[in-house]
């Protein structure tokens, strides 16, 4: 595995306070390291992620940032998992660590897909050939 600079691990932790919800230390570390590696390979900075729109498909008027959207998704996923546990208990158990990690990792590939051009996020050359659902898995 490629060495990850500690700076990017710190950035991932700062972007994702929800990592603390993951109790499994190994899964928390892998989730953090995946984000850190994506940050290390990306042209996008943490500040870019706090300001760029969460999708390129909605047009220039969209004001919801990538990180606001992503963190909301993680909170909604966690709430849904807790509610499933409340209703289904042991009949349909929810692995909350896996649920939270999956929600955090869902769009990590966008860090490789997007580039900044004239202060705006655009789909980069890499993203034209391999979109984020696939690059995020790799």
Please identify what each model-predicted range represents.
Residues 120-138:
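Divalent-cation-assisted or electrostatically stabilized phosphate/pyrophosphate-binding catalytic cores
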Residues 1-123:
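Acidic/His-rich, divalent-metal-binding segments that scaffold phosphate/diphosphate chemistry
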